[in-house]
Amino acid sequence: MSIAPEGRRLLRIEARNSTTPIEKKPPWIKIRAKMGSEYTELHALVKREGLHTVCQEAGCPNIYECWEDREATFLIGGDQCTRRCDFCQIATGKPAALDRGEPLRVAESVRTMGLKYATVTGVARDDLDDGGAWLYAETVRKIHELNPGTGVELLIPDFNADPDLLAEVFSSRPEVLAHNIETVPRIFKRIRPGFRYERSLEVITRAREAGLVTKSNLILGMGETREEISQAMRDLYEAGCDLLTITQYLRPSRLHHPVDRWVKPEEFVELGREAEEIGFAGVMSGPLVRSSYRAGRLYRQAIERRKADAKS
């Protein structure tokens, strides 16, 4: 294999990855579809109105639970990212021109779907002078404007930890500001060459200093050790991270990083307990957990924790 599906030549790392066949999933990696009344109603509405969510387009295994809670995730900034992470299925390339009407359309979709909580994520836009900071901030502002009772979780790139760009994003006051470190320092550069571990921690620290509830994610099965996971959790907590999700890496294609190991469910339980002992206000840990899984519930846990801390 020397040509990518979109017709370009493979990167050297993609060619190396492609020599490893797609791994067989263990029996505990299963999607259990439970279609409740809220999910059924929302699914019909999304289809009827022609709306687009990451939940459907990425085939998220948690769509049944999240939609039952009236929660959904939206991708902004286009479908081409200016950076390439070795686990991510979003294409890397030259993005289309900035669509300044997108924030309003997303907000209208949130209103049409009657969402209680919306997660907004997006691609890195290093081609723009502001890295897309206005787009992220304006999307939060429009959602709040059109949906006063809806919570918004904003999952952002690092904006190179530029204080002015981060301030622009933070000023939109999302209920939760998320930035995912995804993996441990030893393999970080290979997995996320466009990012830096310490810089990602700095983003979380700055968000916490701005008074926001903060969140991050760790993906397991890409070559890290158990000790490194524990240290990464401590690094996040010390950086000011309130909420943490821990998940299993599922390889999108042969061009992506091979799965190093399948983490057993009991290890996820142990890691969840360890994270709670470290002090995180809310933790979701499991093979099919994703960073936006039960996002509204985790946010409420963080608020309750802050209230309790204020009283003590």
From Swiss-Prot:
Species whose genome carries this gene: Thermobifida fusca (strain YX)
Enzyme Commission number: 2.8.1.8
GO MF annotation terms: 4 iron, 4 sulfur cluster binding; lipoate synthase activity; metal ion binding
Protein's recorded name: Lipoyl synthase
InterPro entries membership: Aldolase_TIM, Elp3/MiaA/NifB-like_rSAM, Lipoyl_synth, rSAM
PROSITE patterns: RADICAL_SAM (PS51918)
Pfam name, any one: Radical_SAM
CDD domains with a match to the protein in the record: Radical_SAM
CC annotations in GO: cytoplasm
Keywords noted in UniProt: 4Fe-4S, Cytoplasm, Iron, Iron-sulfur, Metal-binding, S-adenosyl-L-methionine, Transferase
Cell inner membrane found in the keyword field: no
Pathway: Protein modification; protein lipoylation via endogenous pathway; protein N(6)-(lipoyl)lysine from octanoyl-[acyl-carrier-protein]: step 2/2
Family in the record: Belongs to the radical SAM superfamily. Lipoyl synthase family.
Lineage per the UniProt record: Bacteria, Bacillati, Actinomycetota, Actinomycetes, Streptosporangiales
Main location: cytoplasm
Entry binding sites for [4Fe-4S] cluster 2: C81, C85, C88
NCBIfam families given in the database record: lipA (TIGR00510), PRK05481.1 (NF004019), PRK12928.1 (NF009544)
Originating gene: lipA
Chain sites annotated for binding [4Fe-4S] cluster 1: C55, C60, C66, S292
